[in-house]
């Protein structure tokens, strides 16, 4: 995320909408500094990509990964599932606080669905079913 923000800082000089689509894993002090510098002269929007299984983890065995390492977890124990949900809620609060300090709204999308469709829905953009319909919409704008 920090590398992406460094690049955004070079590109977004003034009055630009910077959209961060991320799981926000690994937000640190450097992330906060970079984002604050960007948001000083630009608008920001955060789109959190989340895993619905973290909201309500199922009982049973589950393989989890941080992108590099994998771990098999036995989620039959209710206390472990509750702890995972608590950790997820605390993580959500940190992300919300991070974006609130930047005056950046937060939207959420799931890693289970089509990202483009979810973003269009969140932004209130109706899906276009075919090319003819899209062309007729563009004619209306002229």
Question: Where are the regions a protein language model picked out?
Answer:
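Acidic beta-strand-to-loop metal/phosphate-binding motif
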Residues: 17-23
């Amino acid at each position: 995320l920090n590398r992406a923000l460094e690049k955004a800082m070079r590109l977004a000089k003034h009055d630009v909408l910077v959209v961060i689509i991320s799981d926000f894993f690994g937000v640190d002090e450097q992330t906060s500094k970079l984002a604050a510098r960007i948001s000083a002269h630009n608008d920001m929007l955060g789109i959190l990509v989340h895993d619905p299984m973290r909201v309500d983890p199922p009982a049973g065995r589950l393989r989890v990964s941080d992108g590099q390492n994998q771990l098999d977890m036995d989620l039959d124990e209710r206390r472990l599932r509750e702890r995972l949900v608590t950790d997820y809620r605390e993580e959500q609060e940190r992300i919300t606080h991070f974006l609130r300090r930047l005056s950046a709204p937060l939207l959420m999308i799931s890693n289970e669905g089509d990202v483009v469709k979810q973003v269009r829905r969140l932004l209130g953009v109706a899906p276009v079913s075919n090319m003819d319909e899209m062309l007729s919409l563009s004619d209306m704008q002229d």
